[in-house]
Amino acid sequence: TKKTDFNVYGKVTYEFLRGLNAFVDLQYRHVGVKMEGPTDEINWDNNQRIVYNMDESFNFFNPKFGLNYDITPNHRVYASYAIAHKEPTRNNFENNINAELEMPKAERLNDLELGYKYQSKVFTAGAYFYWMNYKDQFVLTGEIDKIGEAITRNVDKSYRLGVEVEAALKPVDWFRWDVNAT
């Protein structure tokens, strides 16, 4: 298997008003995956090594936009929206070929986040809301492949929705206690 990966990334941050800034992250990513010839797997019906011949490429544009607002030196709110992609792994290709399924698709994530954070010298706390909407997400099927690895397959539509809460206490310089819950 041969995998090539190329990406270009840029980020811009602009302060509109004192304490209010916006950012834009942009990434272009190209991934190529090529598999040729026999593998280590055996077709036990004819005692021949299984041949995988495939050549796939993926072009991803992954933008992220957001706003940060420092209400006071101790209080901050933020909002962001991002699109991210993930290419299939070698295992995804091999397992789909073995099961005679269509080729796996790239995963696409639309991610919206809103948050609040309080910070002082001794105590920090934050609450963050997230909504992650997937297209063709890779999820575990509960199946195991021939060598004992967990199998994942594309699911057409799925989402994650939740709140994360975190806090930290640093009463002295040499000790910090962090807790979080999702």
Tell me what each language-model feature is.
Residues 134-154:
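Surface-exposed, extracytoplasmic segments of Gram-negative outer-membrane nutrient-acquisition systems
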Residues 2-133, 170-172:
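Structural signature of Gram-negative outer-membrane beta-barrels, strongest in the C-terminal barrel
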Residues 90-91, 139, 176:
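A short local structural element in Rossmann-fold oxidoreductases
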Residues 11, 30, 138, 152-155, ...:
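Extracellular/periplasmic, surface-exposed regions of secreted and cell-surface proteins
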Residues 18, 131-133, 153-182:
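Gram-negative outer-membrane beta-barrel transporters
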Residues 1, 35, 138, 152-153, ...:
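Generic preference for hydrophobic/aromatic residues in regular secondary structure cores
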